[in-house]
A protein has these predicted regions:
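Intrinsically disordered and other compositionally biased segments
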Residues: 10-13, 23, 412
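Polar helix-capping/helix-linker motif
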Residues: 6-7, 25, 373, 502
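Predominantly soluble domains enriched in secretory-pathway, periplasmic, or organellar proteins
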Residues: 18-20, 24-374
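Periplasmic c-type cytochrome electron-transfer domains
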Residues: 205-232, 236-239, 243-622
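Prokaryotic Sec-type signal peptides and long signal-anchor helices
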Residues: 9, 20-22, 604
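A general, composition-driven signal for non-globular sequence regions
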Residues: 1, 5-6, 21, 39, ...
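Bacterial N-terminal signal peptides that target proteins for export
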Residues: 2-16
């Protein structure tokens, strides 16, 4: 029969078959298609891993799973991406407000691009000509020309933008908000929002997402923060959300609960997801319960994911990537400082790679492991850890209905120098949180053997090495300088500073000293608390109306404000939430004066406080 076909026809049939095979083959891997703490080069030869605690990026040869080099990049690197099909890297250095371009083969710095603040996720176009970087604060996408190494466009992305991914055709960017899990699609050419998938009011902590290369689906992990449920079996839940990118009505977004997904195994704190090259497998890492889940992606628009298998990965897994040949899945255990190489078929171990040495003291390291753990002895029912509400020491952007009343989650920055702790100053040492560990919220066994001293009573410090380690980690967080004062205080901020320190406004009578707080760890009968008129508007309040004075440093990024979170802007602190001038005398201020005062507050800190001068040692009580 073949004799009846001409050579031209045979060539056409051959070309058709080649095209058909290519269309049915796994989607070609593109390095940097979604943000992560890890990335794999397009040719599958190198892996790069961002080490947040070490301030480094480690380059690994995937031919033999050996470390080639560890490159110093700066404070708290987050996202890392190979640039196009090259072996050059882009690193989002979160703590230094820059994107660093480095050569993976020799570790040399190619260039650095300064950005406004907090670069988190970074992805590269397939041709390597452009980088797109999310700025956690103030919620922007920065486009960078890799040839000139300069920013060429800034796109407003929504508050606290973290996760970022390129669509399969390279025409869209998908971005997720950290505190809402809202996903937006941006048309790259115009920079405008092309589509949006909102999360529910309880969705929280969505830091990364991936796009299916073959199906119109996006996948992101997040938690639900149910602020009206202050107990360990109802407040925090793990999810994977699956937005449908096809046009249509309704939410076009499904949620897959992870606490019942793995054959009834409760998990906590999903951190990242990874997808294989042909879009048929999804991998999820859980930083609280130290697990890796593997799931089949279903083409059913209903279940979306079907559990395949799981393993215990290691301490605090934060990243997962799949090799371009779909043979190996890599998991980054952040607090083991290791990357695991696992077979995709059965998740058996191929190699364990030490990517950095532990840069933390042994005490802080142990405390950090406990802080992120949703396992005994910290937690009894696995759903929650300290980091569920205080990720990396930052607030979760929520106001919780706690037993004592409404409480807005506070930052840990500077906490070592601003004791006592809590809005009500009801804990004078971090070790007092043994009561939280054993209480309804965490339902853990606890870290002290035997009885616990009451809060504000005798010290719990020294009763447990683990509890002291937890305190050491909690007290290790420092401030970042405000991006609003990088060039010094603006004229408006200077005018606001004059108002703030004026005798008439009276702000500095409470917000004093290097940390702008009069909070001190005194004996219970001498604790300094103030009634600022905000403690009588909630019928559930049990401990007001006087509250501890919070530091104002870093205030620009910790909204909503006040103990009950009812000030949605800083201006509202002085307008809607300052009855009878009890929280500073501001009723006489004009609108432009309030604006200047806000500019000053946003500029804090414009220099680092001096803790040696400010620190007050804890009062020893009998």
């Amino acid at each position: 029969m073949l004799s009846h076909f001409s050579r031209a026809t045979l060539r056409s049939v051959s070309l058709f078959l080649v095209t058909l095979v290519a269309a049915c083959s796994p989607h070609a891997a593109q390095a940097g298609a979604s943000n992560s703490l890890m990335d794999i080069s397009a040719d599958g030869k190198l892996l790069a891993c961002s080490n947040r605690d070490s301030g480094t990026v480690t380059v690994v040869s995937l031919a033999n799973h050996k470390v080639l080099r560890e490159i110093q990049v700066g404070k708290h690197p987050e996202g890392v991406s190979f640039i196009g099909d090259s072996h050059n890297l882009a690193v989002a250095v979160y703590g230094e407000d820059k994107v660093l371009l480095v050569s993976a083969p020799d570790g040399g710095v190619i260039g650095a691009v300064d950005v406004f603040d907090e670069p988190y996720g970074v992805v590269s176009t397939a041709d390597g000509s452009r980088l797109f970087v999310t700025l956690d604060y103030p919620g922007q996408i920065v486009e960078i020309d890799t040839k000139t190494r300069k920013p060429i466009r800034t796109i407003e992305a929504g508050p606290f933008a973290r996760g970022i991914a390129l669509g399969p055709k390279g025409e869209r960017l998908y971005v997720t908000e950290f505190y809402t899990s809202t996903v937006r699609a941006f048309d790259i050419e115009s920079g405008k929002v092309a589509d949006e998938w909102k999360g529910s009011s309880t969705d929280n902590l969505a830091r990364q997402l991936v796009v299916n290369p073959r199906r119109p689906k996006v996948y992101l992990s997040h938690i639900r923060s149910r602020v009206n449920e202050a107990h360990g079996s109802g407040s925090i839940f793990p999810y994977v959300a699956v937005p449908d990118t096809r046009p249509g009505e309704g939410s076009r977004r499904r949620r897959v609960p992870m606490d019942t997904f793995g054959q009834g195994r409760i998990t906590a704190n999903p951190w990242e997801v990874g997808i294989n090259p042909d879009g048929t497998q999804l991998y999820i890492v859980f930083a609280g319960t130290n697990e890796l889940f593997a799931a089949n992606i279903e083409d059913d628009d209903y279940r979306e994911l079907v559990f395949r298998r799981m393993i215990i990965a290691g301490n605090n897994p934060r990243a997962v990537r799949v090799s371009p040949d779909d043979q190996t899945v890599y998991v980054y255990n952040a607090l083991d400082f290791q990357v695991l190489a696992l077979k995709t078929s059965d998740l058996s171990n191929v190699a364990t790679i030490d990517v950095t040495t532990n840069p933390l003291t042994s005490e802080v390291h142990r405390g950090k492991i406990l802080f992120y753990s949703a396992l005994p002895p910290m937690v009894g029912r696995r759903w929650i850890s300290c980091s569920s509400c205080h990720p990396d020491g930052q607030p979760d952007g929520r106001t919780w209905k706690n037993p004592e009343g409404l409480r807005n989650t506070q930052s840990f920055a500077g906490m070592a120098y601003t004791h006592p702790v809590h809005w009500s100053a009801d804990r004078d040492e971090v070790q007092d949180f043994e009561h939280t560990i054993r209480g309804p919220l965490m339902q853990g066994q606890g870290l002290i053997r035997g009885a616990v001293n009451p809060p504000l009573g005798k010290l719990n410090k020294g009763l447990s090495a683990d509890l002291d380690a937890l305190a050491a980690y909690a007290d290790s967080h420092d401030f970042s300088l405000s991006p609003h004062s990088k060039g010094g205080l603006s004229d408006a901020a200077k005018r606001g500073r004059t108002i703030f320190f004026s005798e008439k406004a009276n702000c500095a009578s409470c917000h004093s000293g290097p940390f702008l707080t009069d909070s001190k760890p005194l004996s219970p009968d001498k604790l300094i608390r103030h009634d600022v008129g905000t403690g009588n508007d909630d019928p559930g309040e049990k401990m007001g109306p006087a509250y501890d004075t919070p530091t104002l440093l870093g205030l620009y990024r910790t909204g909503p404000w006040l103990h009950h979170g009812k000030a949605t802007t800083l201006a509202e602190v002085f307008t809607k939430n300052n009855p009878n001038d009890k929280h500073g005398v501001t009723s006489h201020l004009k609108e432009n004066d309030i604006s200047d005062l806000v500019e000053f507050l946003k500029a804090l800190p414009y220099e680092q406080p001096v803790p040696d001068v400010a620190r007050v040692s804890k009062v020893e009580k009998k």
